[in-house]
């Protein structure tokens, strides 16, 4: 029975009738099989009171009767609320209906949904959404999302990078099932290492995240949930091929061993073997590659214990550079080549102690160990990196008096061992960081929610770090929600891994000084307005966030001869404004229109060693996104199209070295043109399988000369790290999905 406190007399009355309980099960109905599936974590509460419980992993709940209300409200994100008038019955069976605004949600669609209950501004992307696009891996799941933009980091390696709130993905804490994963050396290719068919859902949170997950979140937090062993699909097969010659196969297998044990095997294999040079500059537009990726995971579920554990393994081999380059030519002075081999191994476990009679209470332990090993070369330059990581997080949660006041407290430990070498320059670093955290939540009937927390971490290299964060949510009306947040972030940068694409150049790498940790403060606010005009549903989301840096890693590429790393001296900030409208003018027809504005600046030293505040490189100031999606009845045919307009951005001066002045007037002058990009997909669904065909960059826009001085790759002006637009033109793809439901 969930504890509550509504006054002494009411408390005594509730205790006296505690034997009179309402129990039940909350389910959703699966469209494919018409069967019921339990909903875990649904909110069940008496209308107008703070008396509330949550459903367990079997969808079950138990709540005492009260005298103040006989209206029982059941709610869960992505489903329509259900209100049941309770009479003499004591056992309820509730089936929640999919909320239309979420039922059709897609990263490429117009109804990316804000979690209505969370004080964090959180967008939710579901499996159904991912199936509407090819989404071959995590990086491609954001290509049409208004908040997150994706681009290639250079014109040779094929590495992709994301931006949110005007800053690179390294400032976003990216977790896999609440375990920090795409960080450190893995930030180079990590987004490519999570196949789309493995993903169950993606949460995108703006602003500093929860202190429970660590101190590295600066502009946001992305959490990816993978397919679970007890998923409803015992077999899921996806095949994909595109006009560039890229092919991949994904196979997910899940098996329920008995009532408590289940297991799953997630596999992926992909390759690109076609040598493509559309712009005829003599370099491959995309690297050849082969990737093998597998996860074996297990789950144990009992009334009092839930445990998940498993292993991951990945191997990838990339080869790029000039079109006639072969791997045996590595180190050649005549032909420029790029190569990268990555091996990654990981063990993870999550164990939770449950308290069935006190669902608000829990104790969890997360343990993760990983090894990331990469060996790369860029022409005659070698770069090797190895990262060994051990992570542990012990979390206890409970209430203070009643469920209006909850808290999480715990201990964490992070061990990172880095061994890098670029040319003849070794970079070795061992970080050992024990920490403790506390986070308090006040929730008044989901109308006003306050989450305040702090953590203290004892870094062996950089001393004690204090990280406070605060999130607020207030519902002005049932249709209007305000959110605000402020928080500090702290991270240790890995310059070579984070600017990996810039190593494909003749630039000399210079560390002007010892690089200190990056420290920032992020604050922002948002308003979400739901509305209904006749038969048209919709919402409007407007937000503004600002990130101020106390210290930031500066990667100075103003001089085409160098990439110089040093600490911030002066100001650095990022302002982000976004307005997004989602409309459903007709049944199964969705429209989305979003505008985003970035104002991002940092202080750079000019040739006279004076500080100049300039717009940050490679950040588009403006972006407009328009999406239209339509589905025929029963989703037999689904159509989706997205048009993006990307505004101008400042790019480095790439003229002759003799003309370069490295002064403010020169640094301000070089801007890329704006461009449009169109993506579209059509899907035909059948009871057990889907067939889809689509295209990307249908406008066929390509950056002119993405590689500077491509004819002389060993000359002083060679640079492939200045890609600001698409390197390849129009791409057509097709695929098949097949599934067997348990």
Where are these regions (language model features)?
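Flexible loop and strand-edge segments within Gram-negative outer membrane beta-barrel domains
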Residues: 272-293, 299-363, 369-387
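Extracytoplasmic beta-strand/coil segments of soluble accessory domains associated
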Residues: 64, 139-183
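C-terminal beta-signal and adjacent terminal beta-strands/loops
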Residues: 645-659, 683-742
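Short, acidic, small-residue-rich periplasmic hinge/interaction motif at the N-terminus
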Residues: 25-47, 75-79, 87-131, 139, ...
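Membrane-embedded beta-barrel scaffold of Gram-negative outer-membrane proteins
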Residues: 364-376, 475, 483, 516-573
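N-terminal periplasmic accessory domains that precede
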Residues: 90-95, 138-141, 160-163, 175, ...
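Short acidic/polar hinge/loop motifs at secondary-structure boundaries
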Residues: 61-64, 179-206, 294, 512
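Gram-negative outer-membrane beta-barrel transporters
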Residues: 443, 544-548, 567-656, 737-739
């Amino acid at each position: 029975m969930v504890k509550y406190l509504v006054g002494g007399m009411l408390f005594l009355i509730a205790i006296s009738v505690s034997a009179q309980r309402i129990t039940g099960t909350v389910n959703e109905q699966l469209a494919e099989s018409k069967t019921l599936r339990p909903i875990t974590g649904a909110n069940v509460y008496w209308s107008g009171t703070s008396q509330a419980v949550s459903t367990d992993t079997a969808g079950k709940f138990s709540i005492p009767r009260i005298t103040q209300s006989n209206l029982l409200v059941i709610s869960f994100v992505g489903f329509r609320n259900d209100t049941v008038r309770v009479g003499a019955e004591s056992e309820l069976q509730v089936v929640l209906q999919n909320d239309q605004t979420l039922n059709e949600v897609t990263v490429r669609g117009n109804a990316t949904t804000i979690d209505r209950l969370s004080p964090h501004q959180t967008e939710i992307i579901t499996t159904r959404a991912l199936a509407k696009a090819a989404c071959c891996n995590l990086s491609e799941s954001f290509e049409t999302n208004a908040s997150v933009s994706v681009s290639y980091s250079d014109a040779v390696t094929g590495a992709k990078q994301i931006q949110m709130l005007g800053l690179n993905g390294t400032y976003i804490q990216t977790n896999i099932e609440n375990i920090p994963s795409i960080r450190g050396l893995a930030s180079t290719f990590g987004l490519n290492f999570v196949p789309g068919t493995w993903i169950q859902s993606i949460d995108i949170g703006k602003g500093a995240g929860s202190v429970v997950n660590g101190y590295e979140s600066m502009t946001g937090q992305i959490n990816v949930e993978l397919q679970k062993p007890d998923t409803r699909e015992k077999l899921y097969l996806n095949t994909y091929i595109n006009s560039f010659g890229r092919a991949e196969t994904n196979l997910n297998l899940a098996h329920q061993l008995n009532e408590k044990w289940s297991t799953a095997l997630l596999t992926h294999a992909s390759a690109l073997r076609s040598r493509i040079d559309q712009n005829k500059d003599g370099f491959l537009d995309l690297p050849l590659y082969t990737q093998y990726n597998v996860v074996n995971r297990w789950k144990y579920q009992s009334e009092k214990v839930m445990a998940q554990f498993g292993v991951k393994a990945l191997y990838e081999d990339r080869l790029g550079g000039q079109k006639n380059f072969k791997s045996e030519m590595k180190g050649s002075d005549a032909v420029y080549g790029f190569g990268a081999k990555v091996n990654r191994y990981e063990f993870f476990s999550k164990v939770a102690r449950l308290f069935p009679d006190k669902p608000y209470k829990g104790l969890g332990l997360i343990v993760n160990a990983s090894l990331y090993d990469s060996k790369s070369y860029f022409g005659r330059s070698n770069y090797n990196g190895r990262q060994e990581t051990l992570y542990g997080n012990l979390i206890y949660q409970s209430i203070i008096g009643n469920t209006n006041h909850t808290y999480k407290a715990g201990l964490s430990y992070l061990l990172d061992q880095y061994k890098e070498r670029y040319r003849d320059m070794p970079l070795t670093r061992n970080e050992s960081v024990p920490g403790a955290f506390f986070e308090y939540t006040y929730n008044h009937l989901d109308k006003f929610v306050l989450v305040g927390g702090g953590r203290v971490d004892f870094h062996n290299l950089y001393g004690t770090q204090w990280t406070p964060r605060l999130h607020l949510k207030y519902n002005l009306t049932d249709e209007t929600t305000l959110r605000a947040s402020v928080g500090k972030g702290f991270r240790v940068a890995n310059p070579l891994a984070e600017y990996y694409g810039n190593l494909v150049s003749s630039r000399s790498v210079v560390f002007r000084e010892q690089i200190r940790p990056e420290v920032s403060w992020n604050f922002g606010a948002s308003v979400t307005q739901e509305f209904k005009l006749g038969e048209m549903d919709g919402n409007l989301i407007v937000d503004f966030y600002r990130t101020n840096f106390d210290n930031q890693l500066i990667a100075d590429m103003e001089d085409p001869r160098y990439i110089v790393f040093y600490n911030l001296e002066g100001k650095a900030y990022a302002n982000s404004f976004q307005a997004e409208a989602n409309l459903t003018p007709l049944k199964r027809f969705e429209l989305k229109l979003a505008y985003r504005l970035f104002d991002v600046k940092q202080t750079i030293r000019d040739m006279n060693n004076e500080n100049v505040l300039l717009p940050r490189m490679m950040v588009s100031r403006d972006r407009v996104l328009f999406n239209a999606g339509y589905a025929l009845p029963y989703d037999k045919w689904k159509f989706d199209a997205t048009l993006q307009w990307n505004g101008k951005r400042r790019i480095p001066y790439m003229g002759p070295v003799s003309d370069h002045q490295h002064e403010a007037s020169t640094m301000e002058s070089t801007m890329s043109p704006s461009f449009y990009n169109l993506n579209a997909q059509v899907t035909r669904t059948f009871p057990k399988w889907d067939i889809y065909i689509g295209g990307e960059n249908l406008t066929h826009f390509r950056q002119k000369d993405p590689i500077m001085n491509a004819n002389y790759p060993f000359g002083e002006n060679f640079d492939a790290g200045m890609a600001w637009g698409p390197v390849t033109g129009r791409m057509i793809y097709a695929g098949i999905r097949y599934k067997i439901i348990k």
